[in-house]
């Protein structure tokens, strides 16, 4: 028996089954059909019949008089009245093999009669609830088969919403169905006569018929879809596939918290319980749970490791189009999917004049402009985003869209948008909505509640903790905060009781705005990694003896809070997917307290937009694509360089829109996986090896669209090759070359960071983020001699101990997780849930912007030459030149022009119309732009106060023609994962 709690949204129950191909999969059920024709011989109506053998005849079971059915539901043959029965011609009777039923309904959501039981053998079920349960059934993948010793899985979905409707149609559970003891029970009805009202509904008929027609061409047996359905239920019931269900009341609650480290490439989450029925309970880290993301298309697949931030618009109905008839049930209002499901949906989407997927919304927090192309939903049945028959785009105007404006912001007018031209920044809100729905489903899942104890208590989300990159711009911090608040608002609109009425988003104790001069975000990623290290050392390894930790790890320093006591200065280099962050903090303990309070003092912080995804791109450009070139030339192909540049380079004038779609798919579905394999190679091998692309894709998922045939066709045609098999291409996994590619992108960053680490006399260097696992990166830090190797700690090799939520026997394979764990520790300390560790983060609120110097970025978008500086440190006005082309303006922290800069603004014409308008005026280039920055916000340039004069000194009315666009993405308006463009060189000839 499984207990669900009322009003906890859609709840999933998984039932593993082991069904061998040799199994009989038999059902004793047999069927016949009655078709009624009109006077013209046209089919008018019909029904499915259930033959019962009586004497030498077969009769329809439903025609047997009630007196001939005993209290157990069995037939009393001698009581059958011949004047009631309907005789069935034996030749019309048929059976359905179990394998056929499996093949028809596998991989589909179908309705399921899970009715309330009653203590009456002749009528063992109430007539409902009808619409609260759906089932998905299918074969599991090989990994799951080995892990769980199962071949198939049933996934039951229950909509636990209850209503006050004792007298009406019994469609949803009533309030009275939920009890504190769970003594009201629900079971799946298998015998057809007990759920005739259920399956005879026209919408159920359409639902099942639509699925059947996808798999089978009907030649006869008009109601065979029903026969398959009944046989499927019978066989799964024989396999004990349908547990008994109880519904508990929702009056007892436990508060939970959600900790999120939202990355450009991946996101990591933890769920914790912050209250307990038992008073004065301290927190046990082993009780925290990893956030799970369920694949709603393949619902038995649940991922609890850090998940991809790829997003794809998709509507989940838990059924086919016929399920639209069922109103106000199974509402999953999220607009998009994330993680592995989004990656898979991206692989089947091909549309030339619309969009449905994006690599990461966090990269586009700066872009609040309305999209020129509409967002449409991916057709999850594989029809490439369009209705198969009508070629009709399905706009993303479902679910939470009723509360949105056209640009994706929350509507205050009450009128929903009719167009899905959402800004790219708004997709951050949509992604957070999906994450919240996934978390809310997880915390009330029966397995979660059973694991945590107090399983009869409803879990309610009270706290959300969010981290951010250490050097994230102030505006992006504001935008991220607004996205979180909008997501919470949208979830509350749909499920008002799912979130605590006093829900808090941390670390925002107070409202923040663009006018704030200090950064509000205490939970920065690099500092959180340091907190994880401190907790592990002080509590786990030094057993709470804080003074010993500082004695053995630190030293006495003059300029500290307590000069007479040891302090530890820790540097963290966090190499994520999109940014590399440095945080140098000095830590001391205030020993006056019974439990020493750790006080971090930030010393230096910095962040660069160069990280793991840039490493992947460089490996593709230095290793993967040159292997393509070499292979094609060995096959005696001609025009190889031109062909590869056409396929994988920048946009060219002779390329169709479909080509650019395939180029993006190649980047994400082929090249990226090949780069991952190269990274795996250098982590595990020193010997050079060659592998075909076919060998690589024995591990990674093959593209399911037309990408491979398209590439093969272009290469055969342009390279004049009679035959070409894409999967035969040899990739040269040369260890030295792969490491060279990694170092080429990351060494300039390491060189700058190690100088600072040496200047600030650090005691420990922590390397966090998944890319820090690369041996070449640690080697670069060791070669700098800034610290002895024993003081350089790579979290990928660090022994945390069994307390760590993501540890496997104390080891952590993915350093990405240290950020969310550190944020959890800091949060628990702030609410006094830790008995051996306290940390005061107040000093971190003084971390301000690193935008000391603003200037025009160089051509490679990574440096600002001194001659191109606009505003220097402690200065508030400057000039730059405009020659008619967009000007990229960036920021850096230090006075050296070799210091890596970050993109901040683009100065350009408002649009082509205003450019043409100005061209009609009598002005000459170059223009000189004088601009000021806000004295209270170092990042803010004031376009309203700019002065523009042309070459001859004539003043131009700038506000009429120009805009200053806040933009943190360098080099174009799209990230390489979103446009698929690579820099190609003829490496094989060098």
Name what the model sees in each region.
Residues 1-398, 611, 615-618, 623-627, ...:
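Early-domain small/polar-rich strand-loop-helix modules and first-structured segments
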Residues 234-253, 427-456, 530-563, 713-761, ...:
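Phosphate/ATP-binding catalytic cores across multiple sugar-kinase/actin-like superfamilies
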Residues 489-524, 528, 782-818:
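Conserved phosphate-binding/catalytic loops in two-lobed NTP-binding clefts
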Residues 260-301, 524-528, 533-627, 862-863:
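Glycine-rich phosphate-binding loop of actin/hexokinase-like ATP-binding domains
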């Amino acid at each position: 028996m499984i207990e669900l709690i009322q009003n906890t949204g859609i709840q999933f129950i998984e039932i593993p089954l082991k069904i061998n191909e040799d199994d009989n999969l038999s059902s004793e059920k047999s069927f016949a059909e009655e078709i009624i024709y009109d006077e013209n011989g046209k089919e008018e109506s019909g029904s499915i019949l259930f033959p019962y053998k009586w004497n030498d005849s077969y009769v329809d079971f439903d025609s047997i008089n009630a007196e001939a059915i005993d209290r157990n539901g069995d037939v009393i043959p001698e009581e059958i009245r011949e004047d009631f029965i309907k005789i069935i011609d034996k030749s019309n009777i048929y059976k359905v093999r179990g394998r056929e039923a499996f093949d028809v309904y596998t991989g589909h959501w179908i309705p399921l009669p899970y009715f309330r039981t009653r203590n009456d053998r002749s009528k063992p079920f109430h007539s409902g609830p009808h619409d609260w349960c759906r089932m998905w059934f299918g074969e599991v993948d090989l990994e799951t088969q080995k892990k769980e010793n199962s071949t198939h899985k049933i996934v039951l979905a229950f909509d636990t919403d209850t209503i006050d409707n004792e007298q009406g149609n019994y469609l949803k559970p009533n309030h009275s169905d939920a009890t504190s003891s769970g003594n009201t029970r629900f079971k799946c009805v298998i015998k057809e006569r007990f759920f005739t009202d259920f399956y005879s509904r026209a919408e159920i008929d359409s639902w099942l018929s639509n699925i059947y027609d996808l798999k089978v061409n009907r030649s006869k047996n008009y109601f065979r879809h029903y026969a398959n359905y009944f046989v499927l239920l019978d066989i799964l019931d024989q396999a004990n596939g349908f547990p008994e269900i109880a519904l508990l009341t929702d009056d007892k609650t436990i508060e939970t918290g959600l900790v999120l480290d939202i990355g450009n490439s991946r996101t990591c989450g933890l769920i914790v319980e912050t209250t307990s029925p038992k008073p004065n309970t301290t927190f046990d880290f082993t009780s925290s749970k990893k956030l799970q993301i369920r694949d709603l298309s393949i619902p038995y697949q649940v991922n609890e490791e850090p998940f991809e931030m790829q997003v794809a618009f998709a509507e989940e109905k838990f059924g086919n189009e016929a399920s639209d008839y069922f109103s106000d049930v199974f509402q999953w209002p999220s607009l998009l999917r994330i993680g592995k499901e989004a990656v898979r949906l991206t692989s089947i989407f091909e549309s030339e004049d619309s969009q449905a997927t994006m690599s990461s919304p966090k990269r586009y927090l700066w872009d609040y402009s309305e999209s020129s192309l509409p967002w449409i939903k991916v057709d999850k049945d594989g029809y490439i985003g369009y209705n198969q028959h009508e070629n009709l785009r399905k706009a993303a105007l479902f679910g939470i869209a009723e509360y949105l404006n056209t640009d994706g912001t929350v509507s205050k007018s009450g009128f929903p948008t009719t167009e899905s031209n959402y800004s790219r920044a708004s997709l951050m809100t949509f992604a957070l909505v999906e994450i919240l729905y996934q978390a809310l489903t997880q915390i009330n899942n029966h397995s979660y509640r059973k694991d945590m104890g107090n399983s009869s208590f409803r879990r309610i989300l009270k706290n959300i903790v969010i981290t951010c990159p250490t050097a994230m711009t102030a505006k992006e911090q504001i935008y991220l905060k607004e996205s979180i608040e909008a997501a919470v608002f949208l979830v509350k609109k749909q499920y008002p009781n799912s979130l605590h009425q006093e829900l808090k988003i941390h670390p925002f104790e107070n409202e923040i705005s663009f006018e704030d001069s200090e950064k509000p975000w205490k939970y920065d990623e690099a500092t959180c990694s340091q907190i994880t290290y401190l907790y592990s050392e002080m509590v786990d390894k030094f057993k709470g003896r804080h003074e010993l930790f500082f004695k053995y790890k630190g030293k006495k320093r003059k300029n500290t809070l307590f000069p007479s006591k040891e302090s530890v200065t820790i540097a963290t280099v966090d190499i994520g997917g999109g940014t590399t962050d440095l945080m140098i903090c000095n830590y001391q303990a205030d020993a006056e307290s019974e439990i020493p309070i750790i006080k971090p003092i930030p010393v230096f912080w910095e962040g660069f937009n160069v990280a793991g995804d840039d490493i992947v791109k460089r490996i593709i450009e230095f290793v993967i694509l040159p292997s393509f070139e070499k292979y094609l030339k060995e096959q005696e192909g001609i025009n190889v360089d031109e062909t590869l540049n056409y396929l994988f380079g920048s946009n060219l004038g002779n390329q169709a829109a479909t080509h650019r779609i395939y180029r993006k798919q190649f980047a994400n579905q082929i090249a990226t996986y090949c780069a991952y394999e190269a990274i795996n190679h250098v982590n595990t091998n020193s010997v050079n090896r060659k592998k075909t692309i076919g060998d690589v894709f024995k591990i990674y998922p093959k593209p399911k669209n037309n990408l491979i045939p398209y590439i093969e066709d272009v290469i055969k045609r342009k390279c004049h090759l009679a035959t070409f098999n894409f999967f035969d291409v040899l990739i040269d996994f040369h260890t030295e070359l792969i490491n060279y590619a990694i170092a080429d992108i990351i060494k300039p960053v390491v060189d700058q960071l190690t100088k600072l680490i040496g200047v600030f006399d650090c005691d420990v260097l922590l390397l966090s983020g998944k890319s820090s696992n690369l041996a070449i990166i640690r080697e670069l830090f060791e070669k700098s001699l800034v610290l002895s190797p024993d003081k350089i700690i790579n979290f990928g090799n660090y022994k945390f101990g069994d307390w760590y939520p993501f540890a496997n026997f104390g080891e952590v394979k993915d350093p990405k997780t240290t950020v969310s764990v550190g944020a959890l520790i800091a949060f628990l300390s702030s609410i006094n849930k830790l008995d051996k560790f306290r940390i005061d983060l107040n000093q971190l609120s003084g971390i301000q912007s690193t935008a000391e110097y603003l200037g025009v970025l160089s051509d490679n978008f990574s440096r600002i030459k001194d001659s191109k500086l606009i505003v220097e440190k402690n200065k508030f006005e400057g000039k730059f030149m405009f020659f008619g082309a967009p000007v990229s303006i960036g920021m850096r922290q230090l006075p050296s022009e070799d210091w890596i800069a970050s993109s901040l603004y683009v100065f350009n014409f408002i649009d082509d119309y205003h450019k043409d308008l100005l061209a009609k005026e009598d002005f000459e280039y170059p223009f000189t732009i004088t601009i000021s920055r806000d004295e209270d916000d170092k990042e803010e340039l004031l376009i309203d106060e700019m002065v523009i004069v042309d070459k001859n000194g004539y003043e131009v009315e700038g506000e009429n023609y120009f805009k200053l666009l806040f933009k943190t993405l360098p080099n174009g308006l799209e990230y390489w994962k979103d446009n698929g463009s690579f820099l190609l060189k003829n490496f094989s000839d060098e």
